[in-house]
């Protein structure tokens, strides 16, 4: 058998990167012929295509230069939780002052090749990961006249192309309120079980930014078309729901092969901007006998004219888990110079788990949120929220 060894060496400022890719099982060099024993590895076939980006790159028209950016949010607030009867609050007191943080450091860079194609990288470091994933997202970006390709750990087209009402304080959508308002007090009157905070984040009980099986930043391949007359389409594929995992997924042990799509419209007509979005995702390969049949849908609509903005979004999730349910978000906002104010509403329904032997609460939540912001300077904003 013949073989190929590809060695790419890229150097810059004392940093060396060495990448080797081997194919087949026999390699020749100029000094000797190495005979290798043929080994049959089951009936394994490998077909792979990839791209490697490094900073700096000696083969690029311009070297990739990574820039450092990101954001930091520091909040100080007070919460009063009602200890009403029958709410399962025994031994729990979540009222009082607290400080909460949300910060990320972003490493981004790109270069344009001689053929006009742009290749970039995006790595996001969580400064407040709360015991979770240290690297939030890490993916490769390829852009050209054909559109854009993302490869790596990142949200899907269904998530990123979704439109929801703009807010100027603590987000009522996508679960930011979870950190302040405890959901362990919300109890199903029928079976006495609590509604976990997991129902807020990336599930329609508290968010319209959703994906099937809450795939979030799992490894994905996503393609976005060019925007034509305001319309853009995005398609995503994820082998499974794991993030930062290079192990081959076991399709007999977990639901795999997720597909997600997003379609949106964004265009201005004079002084009026119109935005609309549709998204859908499902699981193609489910564990036999699971009966999960997970699917997710979301939609959004927004109008902006002058400093006034209006928006509404909806999401529904259908499967046998505790994430099953729907959510509706509506809001209005107004901005003038450095000032901005927003009023938002969210209604969430949670149908509870239908999996045999699993007890999970049903419930509803309604939240109103009034927020204001003031830009103190470039990149510095003071904000406040009452909910």
Where are these regions (language model features)?
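Outer-membrane beta-barrel and related beta-rich outer-membrane complex signature
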Residues: 82-84, 161-169, 247, 288-290, ...
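N-terminal amphipathic/basic-hydrophobic helices that include classical n-h-c signal peptides
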Residues: 1-35
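Detector for outer-membrane/organellar transmembrane beta-barrel domains
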Residues: 256-375
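Outer membrane beta-barrel
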Residues: 61-79, 91-242, 255-257, 265-268
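Transmembrane beta-strands of outer-membrane beta-barrel proteins
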Residues: 66-74, 115, 119-123, 149, ...
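Outer-membrane beta-barrel domain signature
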Residues: 90-96, 127-131, 208-214, 243-254, ...
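Gram-negative bacterial Sec-dependent N-terminal signal peptides
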Residues: 22, 27-60
